């Protein structure tokens, strides 16, 4: 971790505190471009928006993919108060962001707050492989 990383992680934690102060879940994130400037920042708004996907990491990944050119996205770092959940990690991966730096790991979170970690939803499959793959053949991401 560099001194710049530490500064930006502290900002992510401050955004998490601001989110908590507003009655939202205490998570905050920001994007820092290749030149070291803050490009965007956000905090959790799940309760205010009535949107279970309104995590700051998810919102910022969508913003980056929509608003920035590919070269800038790939050279941009996301700083976040907690390690992104699987939903947000998927969005970050798809957005093309180049790096994520987090303060609290998912393991640390689960150890400290075990009751708040929901059990996984059972998933079944794979089924109907030939039909499913026929739709995907030839599709380029």
Model regions: which residues?
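Zinc-dependent deaminase
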Residues: 1-22, 84, 90-141
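A short, polar/acidic, helix/strand-boundary loop motif
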Residues: 2, 46-47
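Small-residue (primarily alanine) positions within well-ordered alpha-helices
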Residues: 12, 16-19, 29, 40, ...
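A short, polar/charged loop-to-alpha-helix boundary motif
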Residues: 48-58, 63
């Amino acid at each position: 971790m560099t001194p710049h990383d530490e500064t930006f992680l502290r900002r992510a934690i401050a955004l998490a505190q601001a989110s908590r102060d507003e009655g939202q879940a205490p998570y905050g994130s920001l994007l820092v471009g290749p030149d070291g400037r803050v490009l965007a920042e956000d905090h959790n708004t799940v309760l205010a928006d009535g949107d279970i996907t309104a995590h700051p990491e998810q919102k910022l990944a969508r913003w980056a993919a929509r608003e920035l050119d590919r070269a800038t996205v790939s050279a941009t770092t996301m700083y976040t108060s907690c390690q992104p959940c699987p939903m947000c990690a998927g969005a970050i991966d798809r957005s093309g962001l180049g790096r994520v730096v987090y303060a609290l790991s998912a393991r640390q979170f689960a150890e400290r707050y075990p009751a708040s970690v929901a059990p996984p939803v059972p998933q079944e499959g794979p089924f109907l492989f030939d039909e499913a793959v026929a739709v995907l053949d030839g599709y380029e991401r």
